[in-house]
Amino acid sequence: MSGQPKRLMVMAGGTGGHVFPGLAVAHHLMAQGWQVRWLGTADRMEADLVPKHGIDIDFIRISGLRGKGVKALLAAPLRIFNAWRQARAIMKRFKPDVVLGMGGYVSGPGGLAAWSLGIPVVLHEQNGIAGLTNQWLARIATTVMQAFPGAFPNAEVVGNPVRTDVLALPLPQVRLAGRDGPIRVLVVGGSQGARVLNQTMPQVAARLGDTVTIWHQSGKGAQLTVEQAYAGTGQPQHKVTEFIDDMAAAYAWADVVVCRSGALTVSEIAAAGLPAIFVPFQHKDRQQYWNALPLENAGAAKIFEQPQFTVEAVADTLAGWSREALLTMAERARAVSIPDATERVASEVSRVART
């Protein structure tokens, strides 16, 4: 790249589902010589995580409005205006050639500030149904991309950027070749765990006996309780950990995953090439259900809404999947993944950047 390096400001915050895809794109462009800064909030995960990746971060003050009450709603216009003013001042100093909104409340005032300064705005929607911030920002964005079809009617489907170690896993037909013995079930509840998984899966293990071996990620503070639940059903041999630091290794070990269906989780499971039982988090817009639906439609997964996630239903489903069936599902999952999502998003950022 000749002359001054291109400048990108990534706007993302709140959850790993927003931050990790943004980091993937940021690192890809930094490797090409881009200068990258981040716009976030000081009290969410990006404040600690982003600097650890060698990226400078600026903060604005903004939070969500749902469930905040009448006073908060009345004060919202002033809060949004102040956040917009803060973001605008930050962008006037940094002078980005393009901004990338990856979701979270910070993207709203950040995107509006960029638009008011004539800076191209690129949006990426990670979920199968668009969040309120991105629905609004799509009206002023230069480009809108989506991970799953349906969030925006005319947006290009580019997938979710996922970690390179997951993308580097051997294909299912290589990884699973010659496996025998008990079916390996990976249970993932996220960093906070998922109570319904923690309560149900030990009883599922009791029904399935020695036909399965389970690695159960319980979430913070729940490891002992879940270990006791397995022991209480006569299944103390299963592995329970509070966290899993190396998810790529866990995916490589597993034959099937039982988990929530956050956008990044679904995309990682598809990229790894794994069958799944998805238990969407119950939310009024059914966001996690729509994330998982493409994999179920492809014959790569089974969705259980939480009321249907019973011991009997899950045990019967797992018992009915042979190793041959699981391999077929794994290949279908990999076939619908978009492994070059990071490159696709980065390419669009490069295309629309100011020259």
UniProtKB/Swiss-Prot annotation:
Q: How does it sit in the membrane?
A: Peripheral membrane protein
Keywords of the record, alphabetical order, are:
Cell cycle, Cell division, Cell inner membrane, Cell membrane, Cell shape, Cell wall biogenesis/degradation, Glycosyltransferase, Membrane, Peptidoglycan synthesis, Transferase
Query: For UDP-N-acetyl-alpha-D-glucosamine, which residues are the binding ones?
Result: T15, G16, G17, N127, R163, S191, I244, A263, L264, T265, V266, S267, E268, Q288
Q: What is its EC number?
A: 2.4.1.227
Q: Where in the cell is it found?
A: Cell inner membrane
What is a GO molecular function of this protein?
UDP-N-acetyl-D-glucosamine:N-acetylmuramoyl-L-alanyl-D-glutamyl-meso-2,6-diaminopimelyl-D-alanyl-D-alanine-diphosphoundecaprenol 4-beta-N-acetylglucosaminlytransferase activity
Looking up CDD domains in the UniProt record yields: GT28_MurG (cd03785)
Q: Name one GO cellular component term.
A: plasma membrane
Which terms does the UniProt entry file under GO BP? carbohydrate metabolic process; cell division; cell wall organization; lipid glycosylation; peptidoglycan biosynthetic process; regulation of cell shape
Q: So what does this one do? A: Cell wall formation. Catalyzes the transfer of a GlcNAc subunit on undecaprenyl-pyrophosphoryl-MurNAc-pentapeptide (lipid intermediate I) to form undecaprenyl-pyrophosphoryl-MurNAc-(pentapeptide)GlcNAc (lipid intermediate II).
Under the heading HAMAP family, the entry gives: MurG
Similarity comment: family membership:
Belongs to the glycosyltransferase 28 family. MurG subfamily.
Protein name as annotated: UDP-N-acetylglucosamine--N-acetylmuramyl-(pentapeptide) pyrophosphoryl-undecaprenol N-acetylglucosamine transferase
Source species: Salmonella paratyphi A (strain AKU_12601)
Q: Name the gene for this chain.
A: murG
